[in-house]
């Protein structure tokens, strides 16, 4: 209907990524982004599960079959998306030691400093690993990491966005120094400003454009590579690929 533009950053998992469109029973359109690899799909399904017990069951079954160290280790592979996915699952479903998983977050954020999610995980590791006497320094470093994540832009995974909000709330209410609480409140203001427009596409994060011509359902071909057009009615989803002439 040309009513909105919804955007998502697609994680390019090793082995491939699928982007699926489906009809919502209410007549809208659902978007799901997931890895092609079946084991990685398990991680994605666990993380995107709306029911915590269901996700916990998927994660527990996964960790019985597959050593988590195969995905989270000091030798960060050229697939940061799966590393992030596994770390996020370890945070949400702590059937393994969360600290064990997050010990590699500094290396992840160093190698892939352009991925906002890596800085969110770094902040999480700093906060849960701090000794009582190190709380002030840990809070300052965590705030720096969360500010970096926010300035880099939208995260790739919806749960990263949830964690960012949770940590800012905790720091706003309980950081050891007043200046840190003030900084967390300021960051919280930036984050919550766009809260009504935030969505999820499977385990991936998506958001609805909320201002200007970009919010009216059309993509400007000067700034977008349009691969396909589609339409939805009560029972059918039609996708038509764009065929561009070869020069």
Name each model-derived stretch.
Residues 57-71, 97-109, 133-153, 175-198, ...:
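Alpha-helical repeat scaffolds
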Residues 236-246:
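Short, low-complexity, Pro/Ser/Thr/Gly-rich segments in the mature regions of secreted, periplasmic
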Residues 30-60, 64-67, 73-93, 113-128, ...:
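Amphipathic alpha-helical repeat scaffolds of TPR domains
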Residues 82, 199-218:
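Extended, charge-rich alpha-helical scaffold/interaction domains
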